[in-house]
Swiss-Prot record:
PANTHER family: BIFUNCTIONAL PROTEIN GLMU, NUCLEOTIDYL TRANSFERASE
Location of this chain's protein in the cell: Cytoplasm
Top-level taxonomic group: Bacteria
Recorded name of the encoding gene: glmU
Chain positions recorded as UDP-N-acetyl-alpha-D-glucosamine binding sites: K20, Q78, G83, T84, S105, G106, D107, G142, E156, N229, R343, K361, Y376, N387
Molecular function terms, GO-annotated: glucosamine-1-phosphate N-acetyltransferase activity; magnesium ion binding; UDP-N-acetylglucosamine diphosphorylase activity
Cofactors: Mg(2+)
Listed name of the protein: Bifunctional protein GlmU
Binding site for acetyl-CoA: A390, N396, Y397, S415, G433, R450
Keywords: Acyltransferase, Cell shape, Cell wall biogenesis/degradation, Cytoplasm, Magnesium, Metal-binding, Multifunctional enzyme, Nucleotidyltransferase, Peptidoglycan synthesis, Repeat, Transferase
HAMAP family: GlmU (MF_01631)
Length: 464
């Protein structure tokens, strides 16, 4: 089986330089949603028909999921763009004669693989199967014209008679059929219609004339066949998607303070008794352990947060690729925020405290370590029970290379210190507040590295 995705349209009503199919829904391009769904159908190949912004569209989806899913992603271009039938004609040289073809639209992102499997089953090996739906207001859609219960044709809005425009069953833009018949029917298309285009929907009348059964698989879920032609439609579909995700999470036992104020732009996996406050955004792959609490207005990307951890409001967690060394890990019982920032490579152990306006990047903090206020830890290895003072930073970059700072167990760093890497502070050592430390320090020592305090009596400030 081959899957053909039409993605050539300009999307004039989007009023954007970005090709329509590359606008984002739930953090992924519209077209990527469709490609990812096609990946679940055991297809031999996916053929994407591009046109407007072809190079940009092709670059955006090339290499995504195809090889790992066991099929190829190929591109053909529709230039000029002379209608949906003309678009699919461009894919003909890549289609096998002995297989089935599923035709999808790149701007209909929420079609589900299960629905497509039902459509494919309805087509069997010898039928033309159309995915249809009833709309109270069918304006703009091709109408399904029947004689009795038998589908006879699809009539586009501009070509429909007043009687046909009263029909509420419409074509979704999705079909499944044998490749051999598709090729034959595409060769018979003409432009004798109100728009002067080659309509893919005209193949229905050819199927009827040739005695090929035409079946309509009707669904009720309008979000699955909703297209995106404007920012208004995109926003509406985004809300529909997020509402569905929120419902699924709540059915799994997640406590959402307000399901209407949640955004999941990837995969969110939650254990038992997780609670999420309002206006939180989850991107990439995020895993929340049992009893995790997420405060309001947090943004969390590619992170694993262990049981009992609390992420206070306005915390940003910015992990790298899932499964890589740059993914963020937060240990059990950790307390993060408010207003904390965990960047790629932050690995926090059990009961670690990261407080307000603390930034951690590419650093490992062992059990019980604390940095509670106004601090930076970059490229650092922090031992158990370390206390890192307010206003302190690791100076990890020399202008060309990054260097590591090691704080061994039970170290105490006073406020407003600068630790210039590479540097090791020995176990149990203390660094006095305001110190700039450039050399390794021995275990258990107090290190003070600051200018001597001088008070000048009767000092008079300059005046104009």
């Amino acid at each position: 089986m081959d899957v053909v995705i039409m993605a050539a349209g300009k999307g004039t009503r989007m009023k954007s330089k970005l090709p329509k199919v590359l606008h984002l829904l739930a953090g992924r391009a519209l077209l990527q949603h469709v490609v990812d769904t096609a990946a679940q159908l055991s297809a031999r190949q996916v053929v994407v028909i591009t046109g407007h912004g072809a190079m940009e569209v092709e670059a955006a989806v090339s290499g995504n999921t195809g090889a790992s899913a066991g099929f190829d992603i190929n591109f053909v271009r529709q230039e000029p763009q002379l209608g949906t039938g003309h678009a699919v004609q461009q894919a003909v040289p890549l289609l096998r004669d002995d297989g089935m073809v599923v035709v999808l639209s790149g701007d209909v992102p929420l079609i589900q693989a299960a629905t497509l499997r039902h459509l494919i089953a309805a087509a069997g090996t010898d039928k033309l199967a159309l995915l249809t739906i009833d709309f109270a207001d069918p304006t703009g859609y091709g109408r399904i014209v029947r004689r009795g219960d038998v589908v006879q044709a699809i009539v586009e809005q501009k070509d429909a008679t007043p009687v046909q425009r009263e029909i509420t069953e419409v074509y979704s833009g999705i079909m499944a059929l044998p490749a051999r018949q598709l090729k034959a029917w595409l060769a018979r298309l003409d432009k004798q219609n109100a728009q002067g285009e080659y309509y893919l929907t005209d193949i229905v009348k050819f199927a009827v004339a040739d005695g090929v059964p035409v079946v309509a698989h009707k669904i009720a879920d309008a979000t699955q066949v909703a297209g995106v032609n404007s920012p208004v439609q995109l926003a509406a579909l985004e809300r529909a998607f997020q509402s569905k995700v929120a419902l699924q999470l709540m059915e799994q036992g997640v406590r959402l303070a307000d399901p209407a104020r949640l955004d999941v732009r990837g995969q969110l996996h939650c254990a038992q008794d997780v609670s999420i406050d309002v206006n939180c955004v989850f991107e990439g792959v995020v895993t929340l352990g049992e009893g995790v609490k997420i405060g309001a207005n947090c943004v969390i990307r590619n992170a694993t947060i262990a049981a009992g951890a609390v992420i206070h409001p306005f915390t940003h967690i910015e992990g790298g690729q899932p499964g890589s060394k740059d993914a963020v890990e937060v240990g059990a019982g950790a307390l993060i925020g408010p207003f904390a920032r965990l960047r790629p490579g932050a690995k926090l152990g059990q009961a670690v405290h990261i407080g307000n306006f603390v930034e951690v990047k590419n650093s490992t903090l062992a059990r019980g370590a604390k940095a509670n206020h106004l601090a930076y830890l970059g490229d650092a290895t922090v031992g158990e029970r370390v206390n890192y003072g307010a206003g302190s930073i690791t100076a990890n970059y020399d202008g060309a290379f990054k260097h590591r700072t090691v704080l061994e167990a039970d170290v105490h760093i006073g406020s407003n210190c600068v630790l210039i890497a590479p540097l090791t502070i020995g176990a149990g050592g203390t660094v006095g507040g305001g110190s700039t430390v450039t050399k390794d320090t021995p275990p258990g020592a107090l290190t003070v590295a600051r200018a001597k305090q001088v008070s000048i009596a009767n000092w008079k400030r300059p005046s104009k």
